[in-house]
């Protein structure tokens, strides 16, 4: 099935209306949950760093920033590694170790930390590339049935609700891989297949530009 512009717009409104619930703050979470989550995070530190900022092995693997994310979104991602709707051979063994309670606790722990960018990447894109990425993020390209990223991911793409994460301050190589995973259907855990449909319409140049622009932005929205 192919969404036409009007149909896709309706789908976007449905998803953002149904899923844009308020993010759980650390103040609303029992301290015992955060303590247990911190203990579980010992499994995550080697790849995602103690700060949750993420890390990378150039040309091999790119580990995302975990902070600044809705905890329910995080739980869904871990569960997806377990059930195979998101494939990553490094993550699956760790995901398989976690109980439902541990997934809940570690996700809330990372959600309670300050959102910080990894320091092991640089954005070397030209101004033209960054401008192209920004245009797609804010305006999309309806001639190709590509909605703006902010239509789902909220103001300045800093995330909204439990299904649309904060996209900013991630390693551009990680963002490129994530989009290509949807294109190649090695990741199928997005609601209504919205990301898969969008990803398949993006060119490699589009993906590079979007990833570069997002990586150039701060991990948390500046006031």
Regions found by a protein language model. Name each.
Residues 38, 52-81, 92-97, 150, ...:
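Gly/Gly-Pro-rich "capping" loops immediately C-terminal to redox-active cysteine motifs
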Residues 191-194, 208:
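Residue-level hotspots at or immediately adjacent to binding/recognition sites across diverse folds
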Residues 37, 42-50, 106, 146-156, ...:
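The canonical Cys-X-X-Cys-His
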Residues 2-12:
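Bacterial N-terminal signal peptides that target proteins for export
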Residues 59-134:
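Acidic (E/D-rich), amphipathic helical modules within compact regulatory domains
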Residues 96-120, 132, 173, 198-223:
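C-terminal capping alpha-helices of c-type cytochrome domains
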Residues 24-41, 54-55, 60, 114-142:
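Electrostatic cytochrome c docking/interface patches
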